[in-house]
C-alpha cells in the first residue's frame, strides 16, 4: 500500500475530533440516553473494533498490516535548508551509507589472515543484494613496474604472499598508500576492514533480506577468536533497530495492559477498576492503530511508544467514573441510577481533562520533526477516542452489570484502602494547618529547577536510542577507534561548469581544502579524487616520488581520469566532473561534537580560499540529523508555552474565570519545571524521546487538577468553608487521584523494559514526573486554594 502524504494525518485528526465532539455532546447534554440504551451505545465501539480489526489484520498471513520504519528520515526536519545540498550531493556521489566489517587481530599481514580475508570477501560478494566489497584483497593499486617499464593498474593483492619478504613488501606498499590506511587497514597493521555497498533497496527490503545477519555470520565464521569482529554502518544500525522495534511492539502493549489492570485491582481491590478502564483505553488504542494501518503509515522510532502511552493515559478517565459509581452504589443507588449519576458528575471534569491532554499532545505538532508531529496528532486523536470511550461505554456497561455485594473487596484491597485513607487524612491535616510552609517548599523547588535550566544538554544522536553497552554502540566505537569511523560527512564542491575538476588549478584548490580539513579536530581521514590522481601520475612518471601530485595540464588530468576505474571514484567526482566530493570520516558522536565538526569544516572551507564561483557545502545524514538538535532546542520552549497557553484558555473557559484558570495551571507547571530541572541536573539529555514529555505531562497532569477543582467548587457552592472543602476533596477524590497517578506511573515504567535506552529514560522520567504531579495536586493545589480562598 502506498502511504499518503503526512498532511493526511491532520485531516484524519480533524474528522475524528468532529465525531468525538458529537459523541461527547451526547454524554454531556443527553446522559440519560447512554444508560437508557446501553446495548446500542456499546454496539458502536464494538462495530468500530470489528472494522479496526479488519483494517489491521491481513487474513492471508495472517499478519498485521503494520509497517515499521527504523530509519532516521522521520527525524529530519523537512524544511531544513541543508536538505537540498544533501540531495544534490547524493545524486552526484551516491548515498552516504557506510557498512563496515572491521577485524582486529595480532597482525593483518600474514598468510592465514589474508587468505581468510580473501574467502570472506568472495563469500560476501556472492550474497544477493551486495554490490561491492572493498578490502585489502579486492582493492585496486596503481604502480610502475621497472622490469617491464609500464604502469600497472591491478589489485593490491593478486595472490596472497607466502614468503616473509614478499609479505613485508606488501605491508610496506599498503601502509604507505594515500588511501588504504584510511579506509581498509589501520596504520598499525592490526585491523582490516571490509567496506560493503549494496544494491538499491528500501530499509524494509534490507531487513527482510537477512543481509545483516548473513554478513556477521560469515565474518565470525571466517575470523574466529582470538580475532575480534566489529560491524557498524547505517544499514546495520537500522536492522538492529527494526528487531528491537518488533520486540517492543509485540510485548510492551500487552504488558502495559496487564500492569494497568493489575495496579487498578491492587490499589482498589476491585477487578472492575482493574479491567474496565484499561479495556476502554485498549479500544481507543486499537482504533488509532487501525487508522495508521488504513493510511499505510509505518510506526517509526518515535511513534513506537504510542501503544503503551495511550493505554496508560486513556485508562485514567475510567478510574474517576468507576470511583464515583462505587460511591453512589454505597449510598444505596441501583446500578442504572449510579451509572447515570457517575456520568453526570464526572462528564465535565473528564471532558476537561481529555481536552487538556489532547491540547498537550497536539502541541507537539508545532515541532519541526515529522516523527514528533505524527506522534502528537495520533496521540491526541487516541486520547480523544479514549475520553469518549470512557464517558459513553463505561457507564453503559455499568448500567448492565449488577452492583457488587457487601464483600466487594479482597483483603489486599481493604488493607490498601485503609492505608490510603490514613495517608490522605495526614495530607489533609497538613494542608489545612500549614499551607504557607507548603507553598514555600514548592517555591524553593521551582526556583532550584529554574536555575538548572541553562545546563540542559540537547542531543539528537540516533545512536543514543541504543544502550551504551549494546553491540551497536560498542562496535561503532571500536571502528572509530581502530579505523576512521563510520560517520561519513560530505564536503561537496560544485565548480559551476562541466569539466571543472579536470582543471589542475581546481584540483589544487581541492588539495588545499583537504589539507585544511585534515587539521580539523575529530577528523580521522579524508579522501578526494586527488588521492587517486596523484599516485597514478607518479606511476605514469616511472615511479618518480616528486611526480606524486596533480599534473600541470588539463590534458594530463583528463588522461588520468580516464584510466581510473569508475567504481573506485564514483563517490568522489560526478560523471561530467563538474562536482567533486571531499569525503570526511569522523568518529564524532553526540550533537555537540557533530555541531562543532560542522562549524570547524566551514571554517576550513573559508581558510582554504576556494576559487571564485566554486560552491562548497558540508552535508551528510549525520549533519542533517544533528540539525534536529538545534531545532529541538529552538522549538521546545515554544511548544511547551503553546501547550500551557492552550490549557490555560481551556481551564479559564471551563471555570469561567481567568484567576481560576491560572490557579489550576500552577500545580501543573511546577512539575514540568521540575522535569526540565532534572534534565539540567544531568539525569538525562533533552533528546527526541525525552522532548515529548514536557507538554504531554502538562496536559496529563491537569486531569486530576480538574477533578479536584470541580469537587472543591461544588462543596464551596454548598456552603462549606475552604478548609472543610479541601479536607473533604482530599478524603473523597484523593483515592482516584492516587490510583490514576500510580496507574500512569506504572504504565510509563513499562517502558523500562524497552530495548531502546532512550525509551527507558523516557519511562523513568515520565513516571517520576507523574508522581511529582500527584504530590502537587494533593499538597500545592490545596495550599493555593486555602491561601487565596478561591
Language-model features, listed with the residues they occupy:
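Short helical (or helix-break) motifs at transmembrane helix termini and adjacent helical loops
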Residues: 309-330, 350-357, 392-393, 696-715, ...
Amino acid at each position: 500500500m502506498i502511504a499518503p502524504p503526512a498532511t493526511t494525518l491532520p485531516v484524519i485528526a480533524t474528522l475524528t475530533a468532529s465525531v468525538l465532539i458529537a459523541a461527547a455532546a451526547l454524554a454531556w447534554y443527553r446522559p440519560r440516553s447512554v444508560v437508557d440504551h446501553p446495548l446500542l451505545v456499546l454496539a458502536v465501539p464494538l462495530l468500530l473494533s470489528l472494522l479496526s480489526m479488519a483494517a489491521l489484520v491481513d487474513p492471508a498471513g495472517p499478519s498485521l498490516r503494520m509497517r515499521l520504519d527504523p530509519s532516521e528520515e522521520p527525524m529530519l526536519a523537512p524544511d531544513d535548508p541543508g536538505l537540498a545540498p544533501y540531495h544534490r550531493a547524493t545524486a552526484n556521489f551516491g548515498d552516504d551509507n557506510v557498512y563496515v566489517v572491521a577485524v582486529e587481530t595480532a597482525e593483518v599481514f600474514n598468510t592465514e589472515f589474508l587468505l581468510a580475508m580473501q574467502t570472506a570477501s568472495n563469500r560476501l560478494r556472492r550474497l544477493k543484494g551486495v554490490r561491492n566489497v572493498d578490502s585489502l584483497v579486492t582493492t585496486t593499486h596503481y604502480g610502475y613496474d621497472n622490469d617491464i617499464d609500464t604502469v600497472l593498474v591491478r589489485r593490491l593483492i593478486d595472490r596472497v604472499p607466502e614468503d616473509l619478504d614478499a609479505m613485508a613488501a606488501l605491508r610496506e606498499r599498503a601502509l604507505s598508500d594515500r588511501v588504504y590506511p584510511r579506509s581498509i587497514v589501520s596504520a598499525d597493521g592490526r585491523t582490516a576492514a571490509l567496506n560493503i555497498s549494496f544494491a538499491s533497496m528500501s530499509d524494509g527490503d534490507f531487513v527482510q533480506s537477512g543481509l545483516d545477519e548473513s554478513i556477521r555470520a560469515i565474518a565470525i565464521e571466517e575470523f574466529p577468536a582470538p580475532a575480534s569482529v566489529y560491524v557498524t554502518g547505517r544499514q546495520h544500525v537500522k536492522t538492529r533497530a527494526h528487531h528491537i522495534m518488533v520486540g517492543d511492539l509485540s510485548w510492551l502493549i500487552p504488558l502495559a495492559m496487564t500492569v494497568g489492570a493489575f495496579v487498578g485491582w491492587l490499589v482498589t481491590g476491585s477487578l472492575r477498576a482493574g479491567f474496565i478502564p484499561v479495556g476502554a483505553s485498549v479500544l481507543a488504542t486499537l482504533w488509532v492503530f487501525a487508522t495508521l494501518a488504513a493510511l499505510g503509515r509505518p510506526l517509526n522510532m518515535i511513534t513506537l511508544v504510542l501503544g503503551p502511552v495511550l493505554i496508560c493515559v486513556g485508562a485514567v478517565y475510567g478510574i474517576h467514573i468507576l470511583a464515583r459509581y462505587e460511591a453512589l452504589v454505597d449510598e444505596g443507588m441501583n446500578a442504572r441510577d449510579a451509572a447515570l449519576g457517575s456520568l453526570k458528575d464526572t462528564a465535565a471534569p473528564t471532558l476537561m481533562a481529555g481536552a487538556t491532554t489532547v491540547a498537550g499532545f497536539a502541541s507537539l505538532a508545532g515541532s519541526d520533526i515529522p516523527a514528533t508531529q505524527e506522534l502528537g496528532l495520533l496521540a491526541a486523536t487516541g486520547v480523544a477516542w479514549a475520553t469518549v470511550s470512557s464517558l459513553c461505554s463505561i457507564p453503559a456497561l455499568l448500567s448492565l452489570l449488577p452492583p457488587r455485594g457487601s464483600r466487594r473487596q479482597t483483603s489486599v484491597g481493604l488493607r490498601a484502602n485503609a492505608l490510603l485513607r490514613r495517608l490522605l487524612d495526614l495530607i489533609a491535616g497538613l494542608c489545612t494547618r500549614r499551607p504557607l510552609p507548603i507553598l514555600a517548599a514548592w517555591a524553593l523547588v521551582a526556583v532550584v529547577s529554574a536555575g538548572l535550566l541553562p545546563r540542559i544538554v540537547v542531543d539528537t544522536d540516533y545512536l543514543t536510542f541504543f544502550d551504551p553497552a549494546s553491540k551497536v554502540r560498542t562496535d561503532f566505537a571500536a571502528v572509530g577507534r581502530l579505523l576512521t569511523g563510520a560517520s561519513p560527512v560530505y564536503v561537496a564542491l560544485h565548480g559551476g561548469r562541466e569539466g571543472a575538476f579536470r582543471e589542475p588549478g581546481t584540483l589544487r584548490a581541492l588539495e588545499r581544502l583537504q589539507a585544511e580539513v585534515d587539521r580539523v579536530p575529530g577528523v580521522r581521514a579524508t579522501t578526494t579524487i586527488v588521492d587517486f590522481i596523484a599516485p597514478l601520475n607518479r606511476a605514469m612518471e616511472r615511479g618518480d616520488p616528486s611526480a606524486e601530485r596533480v599534473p600541470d595540464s588539463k590534458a594530463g588530468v583528463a588522461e588520468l581520469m580516464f584510466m581510473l576505474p569508475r567504481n573506485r571514484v564514483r563517490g568522489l567526482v560526478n560523471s561530467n566532473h563538474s562536482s567533486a566530493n571531499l569525503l570526511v570520516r569522523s568518529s564524532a558522536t553526540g550533537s555537540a561534537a557533530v555541531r562543532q565538526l560542522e562549524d570547524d569544516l566551514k571554517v576550513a572551507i573559508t581558510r582554504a580560499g576556494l576559487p571564485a564561483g566554486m560552491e562548497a557545502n558540508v552535508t551528510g545524514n549525520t549533519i542533517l540529523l544533528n540539525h534536529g538538535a538545534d531545532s529541538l532546542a529552538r522549538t521546545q520552549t515554544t511548544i511547551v508555552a503553546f501547550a500551557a497557553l492552550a490549557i490555560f484558555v481551556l481551564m479559564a473557559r471551563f471555570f469561567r474565570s481567568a484567576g481560576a484558570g491560572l490557579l489550576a495551571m500552577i500545580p501543573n507547571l511546577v512539575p514540568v519545571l521540575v522535569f526540565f530541572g532534572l534534565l539540567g541536573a544531568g539525569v538525562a539529555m533533552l533528546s527526541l524521546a525525552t522532548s515529548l514529555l514536557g507538554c504531554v505531562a502538562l496536559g496529563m497532569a491537569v486531569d486530576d487538577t480538574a477533578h479536584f477543582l470541580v469537587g472543591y467548587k461544588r462543596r464551596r457552592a454548598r456552603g462549606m468553608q475552604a478548609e472543610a472543602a479541601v479536607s473533604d476533596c482530599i478524603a473523597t477524590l484523593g483515592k482516584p487521584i492516587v490510583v490514576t497517578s500510580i496507574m500512569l506511573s506504572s504504565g510509563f515504567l513499562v517502558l523500562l523494559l524497552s530495548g531502546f535506552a532512550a525509551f527507558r529514560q523516557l519511562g523513568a522520567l515520565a513516571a517520576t514526573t507523574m508522581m511529582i504531579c500527584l504530590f502537587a495536586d494533593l499538597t500545592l493545589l490545596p495550599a493555593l486554594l486555602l491561601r487565596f480562598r478561591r
